[in-house]
């Protein structure tokens, strides 16, 4: 089942005299339960693509459907409501509220629902245990490590069972052990919950945890790789080869 369908996506910035086209007619279809990575050199348009797919930014041309809903036809208020209810986000810099505990941060998306406190607590316990942060529930963000903050952020993204989770460089600020911990957890949640995850990354190791990698070059889809039955190490080598052809991806700032 296709959960996200984007057709002929274009995105420009600036005015008629000084127009910069960042996305140049991209088509993307994402199936429910896929873990997909978007890669590309700095300035290729991959973050812009994530922003328009998740409705944080608007397209200049083209259509985006999520669960059959035409995102490009919605007003800003409808979009904000849709994002809150149906989408989850994991950002590079965590975006946690410092005055709330780990548990309170994770429960935030449920505060706008009509769930009972008992049901909310059950959902919290389930996702926090899956992410290995249940013991940290009463701690504040300044009392935990970067990896634990990012897993808290992931808990907040997953708790309301969103249609799609968008992750923008989720391992960008983490050391390699914390990064692999997070990616293992995301991979497990993807399989256990049949969760759909779309992740922008410049790290081939991170991308190797996905089932499919889409490469963007100069605002267009360059190619894509499917993991298929390969192990992660083999897939990683394939990603590295494609990156080498693309050039400049490893040295992103």
Swiss-Prot record:
- What InterPro entries is this protein classified in? AAA+_ATPase (IPR003593), ABC_transporter-like_ATP-bd (IPR003439), MacB-like_ATP-bd (IPR017911), P-loop_NTPase (IPR027417)
Signals that turn on the gene: Expression is induced by bacitracin, via the two-component regulatory system BceS/BceR.
GO CC, one annotated term: plasma membrane
The record's keywords, sorted A to Z, are:
Antibiotic resistance, ATP-binding, Nucleotide-binding, Transport
- Which parts form a coiled-coil structure per UniProt? none
Q: Which Pfam families does the entry link to?
A: ABC_tran
Q: Which of this chain's residues are annotated to bind ATP?
A: 40-47
**Where are its TM segments located?**
none
Give the GO biological process terms: response to antibiotic; transmembrane transport
Molecular function GO labels: ATP binding; ATP hydrolysis activity; transmembrane transporter activity
Its subunit composition reads: The complex is composed of two ATP-binding proteins (BceA) and two transmembrane proteins (BceB).
What is the recorded name of this protein?
A: Bacitracin export ATP-binding protein BceA
Q: Which organism is it from?
A: Bacillus subtilis (strain 168)
């Amino acid at each position: 089942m296709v959960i996200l369908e984007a057709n002929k996506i274009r995105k420009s910035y600036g005015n008629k005299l000084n127009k910069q086209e960042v996305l140049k007619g991209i088509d993307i279809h994402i199936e429910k339960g896929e873990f997909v990575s978007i890669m590309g050199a700095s300035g290729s348009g991959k973050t812009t693509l994530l922003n328009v797919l998740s409705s944080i930014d608007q397209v200049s041309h083209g259509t985006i459907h999520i669960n059959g809903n035409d995102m490009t036809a919605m007003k800003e208020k409808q979009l904000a409501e849709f994002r809150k209810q149906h989408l989850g986000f994991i950002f590079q810099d965590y975006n946690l509220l410092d005055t709330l505990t780990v548990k309170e941060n994770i429960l935030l998306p449920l505060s706008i629902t009509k769930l009972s406190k008992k049901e909310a607590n059950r959902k919290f316990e389930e996702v926090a245990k899956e992410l290995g942060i249940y013991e940290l529930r009463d701690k504040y963000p300044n009392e935990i490590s970067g990896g634990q903050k990012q897993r808290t952020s992931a808990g907040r993204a997953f708790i309301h069972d969103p249609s799609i989770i968008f992750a923008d460089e989720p391992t960008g600020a983490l050391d390699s052990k914390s990064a692999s911990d997070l990616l293992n957890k995301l991979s497990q949640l993807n399989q256990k919950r049949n969760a759909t995850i779309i992740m922008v990354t410049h790290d081939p190791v991170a991308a190797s945890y996905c089932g499919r990698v889409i490469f963007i070059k100069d605002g267009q889809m360059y190619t894509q790789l499917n993991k298929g039955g390969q192990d992660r190490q083999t897939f990683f080598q394939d990603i590295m080869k494609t990156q080498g052809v693309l050039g400049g991806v490893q040295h992103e700032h």
